[in-house]
């Protein structure tokens, strides 16, 4: 998914839900498969199939994820998908 498509997806979901997208800090737990944990709930591990990862952060990308990386994510409507915005 291209960045522009992901942003459009976030915007459409927010409008449909009539609530803003929630920004949540997270940390990379593992990279194969990619798993993250949210700072607000360190016991909840988000699996790779619920994470949208920018191409530059995917394995082999210019800024590939590594365990321990701190991230800012955008939770899509209902908290069923998480888009990684950037490392922090």
Swiss-Prot record:
InterPro entries given in the database record: DUF2577 (IPR022555)
Taxonomic superkingdom: Bacteria
Family: To B.subtilis YqbR.
Name this protein carries in UniProt: Phage-like element PBSX protein XkdR
Organism listed in the record: Bacillus subtilis (strain 168)
